[in-house]
Amino acid sequence: MKSIEVHTDGSCLGNPGPGGWAALLRYNGREKELAGGEAVSTNNRMELMAAIMALETLTEPCQIVLHTDSQYVRQGITEWMPGWVRRNWKTAGCDPVKNRELWERLHAATQRHRIDWRWVKGHNGDPDNERVDVLARNQAIAQRGGLATS
């Protein structure tokens, strides 16, 4: 089973507003960047999309260490998801889970992999987190119709 390191981030200019997501996949000394965006989104949706797209890109089962600066994503997948599934996608307070379609897609994308979900503090000097932050922000800027920066 291949060991893959993944770094993800999402960005939104306003919440909701133009959004971008990015992922960096690293395997055996090689890197692949993924990025995309939506004209109207939220930061949480973009964080979810970054993880989803990274996992869906992998064509075979992998051992993954996935770094995210989103507690929403990390806690959602590692702590809250079992209860949501048990309660038919309702929160502990019986409300519908927000972004359900993305959570279901993420849940499906995790099934063939072994994933260690790691939280990294955003905007704190981690070079890989900073890299995906710039990529995601540039996608959000492009969705707004602006010029991206490096």
Swiss-Prot record:
EC number: 3.1.26.4
Coiled coil: none
A molecular function (GO) term: magnesium ion binding
Cofactor binding summary note: Binds 1 Mg(2+) ion per subunit. May bind a second metal ion at a regulatory site, or after substrate binding.
Enzyme class label: hydrolase
Positions with a binding annotation for Mg(2+) 1: 9, 47, 69
Example GO biological process: DNA replication, removal of RNA primer
Subcellular localization(s) per the UniProt record: Cytoplasm
Main location: cytoplasm
InterPro entries per record: RNase_H, RNaseH-like_sf, RNaseH_domain, RNaseH_sf, RNaseHI
UniProt cross-references to Pfam families, sorted A to Z: RNase_H
Cofactor: Mg(2+)
SUPFAM superfamilies according to UniProt: Ribonuclease H-like (SSF53098)
Record keywords, A-Z: Cytoplasm, Endonuclease, Hydrolase, Magnesium, Metal-binding, Nuclease
PROSITE patterns per UniProt: RNASE_H_1
Listed GO CC annotations: cytoplasm
Function: Endonuclease that specifically degrades the RNA of RNA-DNA hybrids.
Database matches in HAMAP family: RNase_H
Protein name as catalogued: Ribonuclease H
Organism of provenance: Xanthomonas axonopodis pv. citri (strain 306)
Organismal lineage: Bacteria, Pseudomonadati, Pseudomonadota, Gammaproteobacteria, Lysobacterales
Gene that this polypeptide is encoded by: rnhA
